[in-house]
A protein has these predicted regions:
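A broad, low-specificity signal for short, low-complexity segments enriched in glycine/proline
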Residues: 18, 26-32, 49-53, 145-149, ...
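Short, intrinsically disordered N-terminal pre-domain segments
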Residues: 1-19, 214
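Intrinsic-disorder/low-complexity loop/linker signature
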Residues: 1, 18-21, 103, 121, ...
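N-terminal compositionally biased, intrinsically disordered segments and leader/signal-like regions
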Residues: 13, 43, 98, 133-134, ...
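C-terminal interaction-tip segments
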Residues: 24-54, 59-68, 73-111, 179-185, ...
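Intrinsically disordered, low-complexity segments enriched in polar/charged residues with Gly/Pro
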Residues: 1, 43, 163-166
Length: 214
């Protein structure tokens, strides 16, 4: 068994397996101030048009936000007069000067949505999901292209897009996550206009961490 020691610290720093010449390491999360997950649902929405916002997340703080997962789903509660596609996109919004408004605000206060009680509470975030109508857009610069999209076919009432934890964004160890600096955020927007007669509920899931630096 080979041992690698740090020149600046006593004791064993790294073990090397002699059979496979592989390092023995323990994977751990990145160093963060706090780690949170959230799941939420809209009200029963209808008549959404293209680029209506279903979910908005803005980082007010100077600390960066590391986004690990984002997911979306849609359940058709009342069938549309004509069967149609339902689709959503994940967009990065930059240079916020006014947050989106309306809908239901999601507060990350106290221990709400923490992965561990002893972790810090997010410094300053505006997070909200649409109610029975779309959110009202604030002032921000939205990227021209989506980071990801999800779509499904709505022919009858039922599952159109199966709700997922990471079907819009999934960050694995070693990948570079989405980093939201101060006054940057993420939006989940409707990409296909909803036709007559139908309605449904949108579900979102997100996982993120606040760090002192990244």
């Amino acid at each position: 068994m080979a041992i690698i020691q740090s020149g600046g610290a006593a004791g064993t720093a790294l073990l090397i397996d002699p059979t496979f010449a592989a390092a023995r390491v323990a994977m751990r999360p990145v160093d963060t101030l706090g780690w949170n997950s959230v799941g939420a649902a809209t009200g029963n929405v209808s008549a959404l048009v293209i680029n209506n916002t279903a979910f908005s997340f803005r980082n007010f703080a100077s600390n960066p936000i590391i986004v690990r997962r984002v997911g979306v789903g849609f359940i058709t509660t009342t069938a549309f007069t004509a069967p149609q596609q339902i689709s959503f996109g994940l967009l990065v919004a930059r240079s916020f000067t006014a947050s989106d408004s309306g809908g239901t605000a999601i507060a990350f206060t106290g221990n709400n949505c923490k992965h561990r009680t002893s972790l810090g509470t997010p410094t300053s975030i505006d997070c909200r999901i649409a109610s029975t109508t779309a959110l009202t857009s604030g002032t921000r610069v939205v990227d021209a292209n989506t980071v990801a999209m999800q779509a499904g076919w709505s022919g009858v009432a039922g599952t159109t897009i199966a709700p997922g934890l990471n079907n819009l964004l999934g960050h694995d160890a070693g990948d570079y996550p989405i980093i939201l600096q101060q006054n940057e955020g993420l939006l989940i927007v409707n990409l296909t206009a909803m036709g007559a007669g139908g309605s449904g509920i949108t579900y979102i899931a997100a996982e993120f961490a606040e760090a002192s630096a990244f």
